[in-house]
Amino acid sequence: MNYINNKRILTHSALVLAMLGSLVGCGSDSDDTTTPSTTKPPQLSPAVGVKMTGSCSDLLGFQYNNTVISSATLQETGTLTVANKPIGAHCLVKGYMDQRVSPVDGQTYQIGFEMRLPVDWNGRFLYQGNGGTDGNLIPATGQVGSGGPLTNALHDGFAVISSDAGHNASQNPMFGLDPQARINYGYGAITKLTPMAKNLIKTAYGKLPDRSYAGGTSNGGRHAMIAATRLGDQYDGILASTLGFHLPRAAAAQLYTAQQLRRVATDENDLSTALTLSERKVLAKAILDRCDALDGVADGLVQDVEACRTAFDIHQHVPVCSSTRDGTCLSTEQIDVLANIYRGPVNSAGQALYATQPFDPGLVGSNWASWKFESSVGTARDPVAVGILFQVPPDPTVVQNSRQFAFNYNFDTDYLKLSATNDVYTESSMSFMMPPDELNLDKLRNHGGKMIVVQGTADGVFSVDDTQNWYDQLLQHYKNDAKGTAPEFARFFRVPGMNHTRDGIATDQFDALTALVNWVEYGQAPDKIIATARGAGNPSGQVNTELPQDWAPDRSRPLCPYPLIARYNGQGDSEKAENFSCK
């Protein structure tokens, strides 16, 4: 990452800012009850780096409430690498907080963590939110939100913390039987670890972090949203990538997907038989035929998501099989099933229970297929999350019958268990997993904080429409607010074709953290973020083998702040971002 004081200045366009501002109308719906003020939030100053004081072993003596430091060791330069580049020398500190024995299941729980503190520190702290059901201590490198990263926060001098969110791998998914473990997974871990981590930083460097960031992908993006809403005055920058901040609803939607796919699967034990790769390619081509050129160039990407909603109709624009399925067409029932999946789950009264999804050719990606065909019925993902972690009361037998649990899930009765409570489980998953008020970002905004949200349009589990709906409401909530409209402190970027967190048919390699730092500390609002395809020879060493052969291996595109999209300028190499503009 190169920040502005290191000679990289992000392009700033007053025109685009004006366009973004005009999109939010007039009047104010802010719930801020303080005395109205025309004073804008302050511009935060850049972080100032310092060297570590003392040695790593000194940190073994760190004292904090209910915290145990179990090890503190020096990691020499090159112990870790990113994109074949050495990460500098740093202290690796491991420990845990709040060890206890559950009165419900008798298990011993604790919030395990590791912190990596650079010897040569840049003055910044990053809370790394991790994905899935947590339970593992993912190395605290600060790799957030992109395919094949070329750098990470630790490489660039951040102090980074990572945690297991209050349970270990052997307790997955049965930690859902313990009410406090549920809460720690939802929001307890980040709220407890944040002040501890800052105090450990002060011990290591003689000062608190100048700037604090929270970032993560998938469930880690949800953790970042929790930081934005519950801890907005403790963080200066939020990077929420592929965020599942309505995770209980999204997980239940996966069960609906499984039920729909079962209708057309030739083998219910292999849901990929419901829609083969050849058949997914038929659908992708139909989408591209109607929507590819809407952004000014036919390039295999659908940038104009909104226009495509009107231009493409799955009931009208997909070849229909006249007899048996042969991979060149879709049956009428397959089309109905896909229409239902992309509409999202409903109950018997027709009430929408999650969000729609846009049709995108990225559905040919194996990442998309894995979430739809495997995770929707598997023992490690959605059924166990719904049945053990999110519903009240939990049902531990789901581990043994996850497929049948998904197939038999009742969206009238079972879905209500996501918001249920009882004497043991006094907080529902709709409370502990989701932000308390997802539209109130006053604490973040009012002290000068900023937020970047990124999501792929072909995500196989968390709908980009769900995130977009939230952002549309945020635009309305802060419209014409004297303290700052939404685009002045929070921006949402869609990644066309990208599957869950990465992959798909997409330019999925980008550096949103640098963009966030330059916005927070230097006032340079991100009018675009350049994204690159990971074709042959990509310097990350992580090649996306599913990219079309007619793409340049280093194809680039600007990711645009919603509602703007990347449009071809009409001339120049269409493989290069420089020939596209956000309009």
Give, region by region, the residue ranges found by the protein language model.
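Short beta-strand/loop motif that positions the catalytic acidic residue
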Residues: 453-455
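C-terminal motif of bacterial Sec signal peptides marking the signal peptidase cleavage site
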Residues: 21-25
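Cap/lid segment of the alpha/beta-hydrolase catalytic domain
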Residues: 122, 130-206, 252-253, 403-433, ...
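Bacterial N-terminal signal peptides that target proteins for export
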Residues: 2-14
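Catalytic-loop region of hydrolases
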Residues: 31-124, 136-140, 147-148, 284, ...
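Gly/Ala-rich beta-loop-alpha elbow adjacent to hydrolase catalytic centers
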Residues: 216-220, 224, 459
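Alpha/beta-hydrolase fold nucleophile elbow
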Residues: 207-218
